[in-house]
Amino acid sequence: MWESRSVSEQQPAVPAPTPVPEVHPVWEELEADGPQVGIVIPDEADRERIEAACNELLERAITFEVRVLSAHRNPREVAEYASTAMLRGVRVVIAAAGGAAALPGVIASYTELPVIGVPIERGNLGGMDALMSVVQMPDGVPVACMAINGARNAAIFAARILAQGAPPPAEF
């Protein structure tokens, strides 16, 4: 049968508080001179489609890098890029893709950085297939979706994201 116990016998003693470990800001370890924006395209042929984004970032004096990585042809390299981008100084990723447009979502699944997806027009569907792929990310894998071929808007949006962590401009 059941034994009768006092309250102090039934509940374990409260453990002593654990000392709080010393915390140092992780930002000090990040590469300060790295590119602020990472632009990823799945194929060298897509470079012209992101030219407007590159020009916009150059005009705004925002550093960036362009990488050619395919979610289908080299998924390990995509995972490596996305998981280490923050350590290299990247603060926002722009990922352009057409067709199945898996690239933005795959990158978002491997990083905590904001990811901006740019659907690219390819084939007979006029980019609608890519748009639907980018805009319909599963719960927990957020990707901001621009218009079809909206690379320039992606760069402007990236600049606005970066501005959130910067001091306000001296003049408006």
PLM segments and residue spans:
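Short beta->alpha connector loops at strand-helix junctions that form conserved
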Residues: 41, 97, 118-121, 146-147
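C-terminal binding/interaction regions
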Residues: 24-32, 41, 45-46, 126-172
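N-terminal beta-loop-helix "entrance" segment that forms/cooperates
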Residues: 66-87
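Short glycine/serine/threonine-rich phosphate/pyrophosphate-binding segments
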Residues: 46-51, 75-78, 97-106, 125-128, ...
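Glycine-rich phosphate-binding loop
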Residues: 81-119
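Glycine-rich phosphate/diphosphate-binding loop of Rossmann-like nucleotide-binding domains
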Residues: 34-73
